[in-house]
């Protein structure tokens, strides 16, 4: 996520329970440790944070794999980070391992909850939910399940008018991006927005992160790199960094696209 106050990009190193900051002036530095596994939740895997976002007040909100929660960072620039858990249960059961998030204009958080942060995935003894869902949370209401029929919900984005939600399904047997109508009480009219199953047979990677550009073009990390898709799901082209790409985001002015590719943070000039 781009952080204007730091004039830099924050990104997660999931398996090492760390988050890093990169700025033009200072380069790379460790920003958070631990980033997502603080022994808050029962877990036999030590993954850290995954998806990151800023709320309307500039607070850092984290999808924490290890702690199985959506949390807020309460102290910037301190040696030991302190987190406030926003949501970690649904109907009295632990979430799986929140993966990615997006905010709507009212400040609600939509987030995905696949089992990647559990050592044995769907078969893990600590998994309490019998599905991998997409949820909506806000400070004004209880967490709400909006979609439960995807096998591996991952990256998530909203259309510019917030009437459509896009969710990546990172499943090697069903590598697609789904689109849903956004209603007050959940998602409806689920349909395949883009089918990547043929591409993923010849290109490395599955659909993962999604980012909506102000032009309405969706930047989707997936087979071969970062796919550019228009609002009708037409594949406009692919940015191919040569490595499996996990996530991407823009800087404040959308001059650059930043992407995390295996062991590399890269950027591509857009304008």
Label each region the model flagged:
Residues 1-271:
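Sequence-structural signature of mature extracellular/luminal beta-sheet repeat domains
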């Amino acid at each position: 996520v781009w952080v204007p106050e730091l004039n830099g990009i924050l990104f997660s190193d999931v398996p090492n329970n760390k988050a890093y900051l990169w700025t033009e002036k200072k380069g790379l530095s460790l920003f958070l440790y631990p980033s997502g596994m603080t022994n808050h939740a029962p877990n036999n895997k030590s993954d850290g944070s995954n998806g990151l976002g800023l709320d309307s007040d500039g607070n850092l909100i984290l999808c924490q794999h290890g702690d199985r929660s959506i949390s807020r960072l309460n102290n910037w620039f301190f040696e030991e980070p302190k987190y406030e858990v926003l949501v970690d249960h649904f109907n009295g059961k632990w979430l799986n391992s929140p993966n990615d998030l997006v905010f709507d204009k009212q400040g609600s958080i939509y987030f995905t909850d696949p089992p990647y942060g559990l050592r044995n995935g769907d078969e893990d003894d600590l998994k309490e939910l019998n599905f991998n869902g997409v949820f909506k949370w806000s400070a004004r209401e209880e967490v709400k399940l909006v979609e439960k029929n995807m096998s591996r919900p991952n990256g998530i984005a909203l259309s510019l008018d917030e009437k459509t939600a896009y969710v990546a399904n990172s499943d090697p047997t069903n590598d697609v991006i789904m689109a849903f109508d956004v209603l007050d009480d959940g998602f409806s009219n689920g349909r395949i927005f883009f089918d990547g199953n043929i591409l993923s047979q010849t290109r490395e990677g599955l659909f993962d992160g999604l980012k909506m550009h102000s032009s309405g073009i969706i930047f989707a990390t997936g087979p071969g790199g970062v796919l550019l898709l228009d609002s009708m799901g037409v594949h406009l082209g692919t940015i191919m960094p040569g490595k499996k790409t996990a996530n991407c985001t823009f800087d404040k002015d959308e001059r650059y696209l930043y992407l995390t590719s295996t062991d590399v943070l890269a950027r591509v000039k857009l304008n």
